[in-house]
Structures are given as C-alpha cells and as structure tokens.
Amino acid sequence: MSDTSAKHIDTLLQHLGSAPFNPDTGAAPVNLPSVRASTVRFQSLAKLEDAQRRKAAGERASTYGRMGMDTHAALEQVFAELEGGTHCYLASSGLAGISMVFLSLLSAGEHALVADCAYGPVHELHEAVLSRLGIDVTFFDAKADLASLVRPTTRLIFAEAPGSLLFEMLDMPALARFAKQHDLILATDNTWGSGYIYRPLTLGAQVSVIAGTKYVGGHSDLMLGAVVTNDEAIAKRLNRTQYALGYSVSADDAWLALRGVRTMPVRMAQHARHALEVCEFLQNRPEVVRLYHPAWPADPGHALWQRDCSGSNGMLAVQLGLSPQAARDFVNALTLFGIGFSWGGFESLVQLVTPGELARHQYWQGGSDALVRLHIGLESPADLIADLAQALDRAA
C-alpha cells in the first residue's frame, strides 16, 4: 500500500502518482498507465456540470483531453510536491511554461523586470510576442539598483537561478523581499534545480517554472514544462490562460516524466558527483581560466548555493584562454560529449557559447576568452576526464 505521508522527497518520488487499486480486484499496476484520450464522457449531466464548476474555480478537473487525464494529474501532483506548491499547470515545453507565466500575469501597457541570466529564448519571447502585445521588458543584472528600474506599470520580476549559461546564483530571498515591498510578483525558472535541489517557492517566490524536458525526464526523450504556484489568485490566472491558449502535453510525455522522477534521486547525485570530479581535473589545466559551477568552492555564488540549495547537478561552464579556432578544435575533438543545446539527460553534452550570447550577461567578465558549457552525464568520470584531456591537448 502506498504511503505518501513520508516526508523525504526521495521516498515521495517513488510513491506519488501511483495507480489506484481496482476496487473489484484489489490490484494495481506499479506504473500508472499512459491515459491517451481526447474525449471524456460522464455518468450524468450533474457530474459534467460539477467538473465544469471545479475547472472554472481553478481546481483540477478533466472535461476534455486537452485539459489532461489521470496521467497528467499524477504528474501535476509530483511537480507540486517537488516545488512545495499547491497548484501545477503543464505546458508543452519549458519555454511554453514561461510564456504561460508572462501571458497570465501581464497585460498590455504593463512592465516586467527580467534577470539577464535568464534562458536565452526569453529575449525572443519578448521581441517576437510580448512587445507586439504592448508588454515591456527590462533586463537587469544582479548588481543593478532594482528600485530605479521599477515603474508604476511594473508587475513582475522574472529570474533564473542559477543562471542559464554561467550558473550565477541570485539571492532569491532578497529578491522576494524586494518584490513584496513593491507589490510585484516574483516568478522563477527553476529548471536547474527542478524542485529537487532548489525550491524558490520556499524562498519567497510565488511562481516557479520547470522544463521537465531536462532533469525530471532525465532520458532526453520528452518535452514538457510545468508552472507551479502556492498563490491562489495567481493559480486562477494561470488556470484560465492555460485553458484559453490551449496549452497541452501528450499523455506519453507525461508518462515518461513520471518514469523519470522515480530515478531522479540517484541520477542527480551521480551527475553532481561527476561534475565535481571534472572540476577537480579542469582546475589544474593551463587552458582553464575559470570554472562556473555554484557547488565548486571557488565559485562566487558558492555561499548562496550552500545556503539555499540541497544539492547540485551536472551543469558547469568553463572559461578557456583559447583562440576562437582553438576552442572550436577542442569541442570537435571531444568523443564522449555530444554537441548540443540541451541538458539533463543521461548523456554528456558540450555547447560552445557564442560572443553574442555572452554579451547579454553582465556576470561575464571574460572578454574574448572562449566559454564552453558542459553537461556531465552518467558515464564514468574517468572516461570523461580522459576525453577532456585529449581534446584540450589537441586544441593547445
């Protein structure tokens, strides 16, 4: 029998979202099946009308497949537990989740403050969509005088911590106090922590977005996002926007995410352990100027990481004193690191960050140095280190 009264998240992740027992047979599958359905039928009009009332009030209710079935409801429960929230709304990707936040909480003529370390496509969301709708955005760096940037029309602060490319730690409790002082909503992109090692809602944020594509899924085979809140009024706005704009997730992707969270505790621990071993190696290489990884003791954000996080993951960035061509040679010489933009799966990945991407980040002080972002996967760290060594030797 499943007991979800246990407090430790590792235990909860093994039991939340389990299939209920069949009342006739007393049996249940270990894994909740993927419920693929476009149409929902009801026993009576009264049952249908009750579901419609609950949905209109912002509660979880299925009246049509687009709103999600049992598989989706189970995953929403898992995300809410991960983040310490009360309501969860699914979207087809992490960026779709971010767009749900902006479109739910902002109207024409209103203004948002967005941390410059946020996920790069947020700039495209602003330029292609938000600006066209009359929503203004100001990007700020962590050292900025935020009070000077607040306008009478400012409604939202959106931050990603640690940051997307350089893993800059932000003081989330301080941002939360500032937001409360100015009557602003604080929303975060928490894909790095995914609720397992970092929980912005417990630090004062009101909304947290996770790209379940990454560490929640863990196998590089699904796409989905989740928006979690612990604020009833915000939940109603998210609920209405999710419905009105047709945000939807396939049942199979939701099922894959439920599968992924079962192994999240062991995967996250191994990613984090391997990343620190790689940092130990890289710090002694002459080509390496600086490491960006908040769990690394020399990282400027290490104290904030110790205070606010319960663990780490496989993400790090490496500043290299190499020419542009040598940096390209290094990336191309790697054999165990796939060249790609994503992360959070079982595999190791490398991304050569462009100067244009770095120019948006005030945290970057590396000038013309090269920057590579590494995702350290579940492979043997000795093999990964050997691969990095031979690639650096070839690029030198």
Swiss-Prot record:
Residues where N6-(pyridoxal phosphate)lysine is found: 214
Q: What class of enzyme is it?
A: lyase
Q: Name one GO molecular function term.
A: pyridoxal phosphate binding
In Pfam terms, one family for this protein is Cys_Met_Meta_PP
Q: In which pathway does it act?
A: Amino-acid biosynthesis; L-methionine biosynthesis via de novo pathway; L-homocysteine from L-cystathionine: step 1/1
What is the E.C. number? 4.4.1.13
Q: Record's Gene Ontology CC terms?
A: cytoplasm
Indicate yes or no for the key word Amino-acid biosynthesis. yes
A biological process term (GO) from this entry? transsulfuration
Required co-factor(s) are: pyridoxal 5'-phosphate
Q: Which UniProt keywords apply?
A: Amino-acid biosynthesis, Cytoplasm, Lyase, Methionine biosynthesis, Pyridoxal phosphate
Catalyses which reaction(s)? L,L-cystathionine + H2O = L-homocysteine + pyruvate + NH4(+); an S-substituted L-cysteine + H2O = a thiol + pyruvate + NH4(+)
Cellular compartments annotated: Cytoplasm
State the oligomer form and interacting partners.
Homodimer.
Free-text function comment from the UniProt entry: Catalyzes the cleavage of cystathionine to homocysteine, pyruvate and ammonia during methionine biosynthesis. Also has cytotoxic activity toward osteogenic, osteosarcoma and tracheal cells, in vitro. The chemical basis for cell toxicity might be the formation and subsequent transfer of sulfane-sulfur to proteins, derived via beta-cystathionase cleavage of L-cystine.
Family according to the record: Belongs to the trans-sulfuration enzymes family.
Concerning NCBIfam families, the annotation shows: cysta_beta_ly_B
Protein name as catalogued: Cystathionine beta-lyase
